[in-house]
């Protein structure tokens, strides 16, 4: 009986590319903050969210959770050689400014801060007013 040899499929490791500049997308919602760091073409280098770094429930919406998420994403991106970034903010959550401050404190040079919050031209009906 002839045994057919099959090649073992190993896990492909992504090679770290040296990317000097990139774009940081910060999406700050009322429930969470998501920080994605991409190269200028839009390919994701690293990402982090308040839930990924260990916060759950109402603590995800805090400014401190956004700070920790931004530091985590920046640290992983700086391993790829990232130095200078543009920041694109989206949303009206608590973690907007604190995420930008954390990026600067992590050692990234912020060249542009852009606000891309989507504003409806009288689109969908908003959710009900909160009564406390």
Curated annotation (Swiss-Prot):
Presence of the UniProt keyword Ribonucleoprotein in the record: yes
A GO MF label: rRNA binding
One Pfam family here: Ribosomal_S11
Keyword annotations: Ribonucleoprotein, Ribosomal protein, RNA-binding, rRNA-binding
Keyword Manganese: no
GO cellular component: ribonucleoprotein complex; ribosome
PROSITE patterns in the record: RIBOSOMAL_S11
UniProt cross-references to SUPFAM superfamilies, sorted A to Z: Translational machinery components
One example of a Gene Ontology biological process annotation: translation
Family per similarity comment: Belongs to the universal ribosomal protein uS11 family.
Protein's job: Located on the platform of the 30S subunit, it bridges several disparate RNA helices of the 16S rRNA. Forms part of the Shine-Dalgarno cleft in the 70S ribosome.
Complex and partners: Part of the 30S ribosomal subunit. Interacts with proteins S7 and S18. Binds to IF-3.
Protein name as it appears in the record: Small ribosomal subunit protein uS11
Originating species: Chlamydia felis (strain Fe/C-56)
Organism lineage: Bacteria, Pseudomonadati, Chlamydiota, Chlamydiia, Chlamydiales
Gene expressing this chain: rpsK
